[in-house]
């Protein structure tokens, strides 16, 4: 049968797949594919009424509030549950629509099949192996990455906050961009946002640069041929990185508090106590210093490996040309190390930007700042969001801040990666 005859014969069958998914495939003896498409449609139709009801709930967020009559509580609509269920229903509809389109395309491209059912299973497994393997990861990504992001975005357009809009006691309403306007228009909120943003940038930049620099110094020192006990020193320097960060931060908090061992020692030698964690400037310097202590060993190992990849011929040639040690470092060592670790620096900056543990476990965002709204002097965005949600239930503003952080970090990371020579070299390979 030639192609023209096949098209003429298959043309009347195509409309079947517009009404019954898999109809064309089943009529052409593709029992496996046709059965899968048909089963998906049956499942979707069985739950269609529930899906429609859930989608309506996404737009209304509920109409009946909880009612209390004495000791009796009559439950109403839970707006947040309805929002989450509505998002899930929307994703299901989107996946079904995608499957429906794939069904139509497959129906147009399929000819008559002469394989047995077992052979069809084997062929489907061979042809769609990558799709089958990636499907669980794809669904997991939707559930654990896409779904939370979408919900966060939607919450930012609601009034989900204490004390008057916390389900199930109260309903939540859509408010548009009111929360975004409030964050930047109201002085108490805008001052807090700008203050926390400034400190977050200072913290992320200083923590990244100082950690990298200190690790670089350690790696260069241990790379010297005349240094004694290099292996022992390397082991000692690695210990802060080997100890769990959670434990290290709590130990430093214990050591540096007002009545901790460090201040007790200072008092014993006749010196005054130092408010490491209770004075704003001291607290900021302390959290950066502790971050350097924890992170420098990692960069030491990373840079030590990068140094071994630099050819000694470059240094020998530069010595012949009369280059000094500083010129060798400036023109050879530093550029070649940065070329290898630049992507890691960007990721470290993004990590420090959201480094919840380093701030919260040491200072809990303190000391308190009376000029800020629900934030302290050392709070960064992520710890401020934590307080807004867990302590004060201001979910609407927390969602707005989360969106801003997500957009900023995404843009910065993409821009930096695309500008890096290492990224361009990889793309050109």
Regions found by a protein language model. Give the residues of each.
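N-terminal signal-anchor/first transmembrane alpha helix
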Residues: 2-13, 19-27, 31-34, 38-46, ...
